[in-house]
C-alpha cells in the first residue's frame, strides 16, 4: 500500500552529492535467481513495479527485526565494527577510495564516509531495487556515496583503484565459485598497501557443535544455500588462490561497535 509513495520519494531530487548508476542489461547470477533468498518472493533483485524500491524498504525494516536491534538503530553495526577494528589495529590507515561489495541497502556503506570523510566511497550490488533504496536513504542522511549495479565477480573499476575493499555478510549469500571470482577481483582492484576485509558471522570452528547446528538452521529453512560451506572457508587458502600472499591473510573476531558504545 505504501509502495507508490516510496517510489515517488526515492525518485525526488537530492543534493547530498551521491550517484546511482543502474545497468538494466546486467545478468543476475543464477545463485540469486534459483532461490528466493531469505524466503522473500523474488529475492532482492526482482522488479515488481517501475523504479521499484520495495526490496530495500522491506530489508531495511526486516533486518532490524531479524537481528532484534543488535545491529544498532541504523543497522550499520557491521560496518562500524570493521571501522573500529581498523582504528584499533591500523590506526594510521587512511583510505582514499573505499569499495563495498554487495552493499544492499548501504547500511554498512554509509559509516565509511562518516568516518573517512575525505574518502570516495563506492558500493556495488546486482539488485536495482536495493540500490535505488540505498541511494535515496544515503542522500536523505546527507551522505554522498556512489552506487552502481554491478556483479562483484566482474566490475568495471580500474586495476589498483581502491585502498579498502569490504563486504558485510556477502560471503554466505554467494556460491563458492562466485566467491573465488570475487576474491580475484579484490586482488585486481586493491591498491598497494590496501586491505580487503570480508565481515561474516563466526566460522563454525569458532563455536561449539550445538551453536553451529542452530545457526545451520538457516541453510535449510531460510533459503541460505551457501551458509554451511561459507562458514568453513580457510582464509589463507582463499587468499593464495586469488593471488594474495597467504602469510598476510588474517582471521579475527571483531567486537560489536554498537555494543561497545552502549
Predicted regions and their residues:
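Conserved class I S-adenosyl-L-methionine
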Residues: 94-104
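Class I SAM-dependent methyltransferase SAM/SAH-binding core
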Residues: 99, 107-154
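A short SAM/SAH-binding and catalytic strip from SAM-dependent methyltransferases
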Residues: 163-177
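A short acidic, Gly/Pro-enriched loop at the edge of an enzyme's catalytic core
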Residues: 153-165
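C-terminal alpha-helical "lid/dimerization" subdomain adjacent to the S-adenosyl-L-methionine
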Residues: 197-253
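Conserved alpha-helix/loop element of class I SAM-dependent methyltransferases that forms part
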Residues: 58, 72-94
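N-terminal auxiliary segments of SAM/dcSAM-dependent transferases
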Residues: 1-50
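A short glycine-rich, Lys/Arg-flanked "PGG" loop and its adjoining helix->strand segment in the class I
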Residues: 180-192
Amino acid at each position: 500500500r505504501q509502495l507508490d509513495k516510496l517510489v515517488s520519494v526515492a525518485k525526488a531530487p537530492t543534493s547530498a552529492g551521491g550517484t546511482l548508476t543502474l545497468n538494466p542489461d546486467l545478468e543476475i547470477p543464477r545463485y540469486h535467481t534459483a532461490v528466493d533468498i531469505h524466503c522473500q518472493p523474488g529475492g532482492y533483485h526482482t522488479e515488481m513495479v517501475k523504479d521499484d524500491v520495495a526490496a530495500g524498504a522491506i530489508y531495511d525494516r526486516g533486518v532490524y527485526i531479524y537481528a532484534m536491534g543488535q545491529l544498532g538503530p541504523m543497522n550499520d553495526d557491521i560496518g562500524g565494527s570493521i571501522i573500529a577494528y581498523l582504528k584499533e589495529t591500523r590506526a594510521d590507515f587512511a583510505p582514499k577510495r573505499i569499495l563495498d561489495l554487495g552493499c544492499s541497502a548501504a547500511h554498512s556503506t554509509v559509516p565509511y564516509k562518516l568516518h573517512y570523510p575525505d574518502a570516495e566511497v563506492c558500493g556495488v550490488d546486482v539488485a536495482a531495487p536495493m540500490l535505488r533504496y540505498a541511494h535515496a536513504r544515503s542522500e536523505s542522511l546527507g551522505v554522498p556515496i556512489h552506487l552502481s549495479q554491478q556483479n562483484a565477480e566482474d566490475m568495471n573499476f580500474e586495476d589498483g583503484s581502491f585502498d579498502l575493499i569490504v563486504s558485510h555478510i556477502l560471503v554466505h549469500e554467494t556460491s563458492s565459485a562466485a566467491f573465488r571470482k570475487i576474491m580475484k577481483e579484490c586482488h585486481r582492484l586493491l591498491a598497494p598497501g590496501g586491505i580487503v576485509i570480508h565481515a561474516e558471522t563466526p566460522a563454525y570452528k569458532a563455536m561449539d557443535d550445538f551453536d553451529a547446528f542452530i545457526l545451520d538452521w538457516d541453510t535449510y529453512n531460510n533459503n541460505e544455500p551457501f551458509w554451511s560451506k561459507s562458514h568453513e572457508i580457510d582464509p589463507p587458502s582463499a587468499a593464495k588462490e586469488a593471488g594474495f600472499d597467504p602469510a598476510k591473510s588474517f582471521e579475527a573476531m571483531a567486537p560489536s561497535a554498537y555494543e561497545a558504545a552502549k
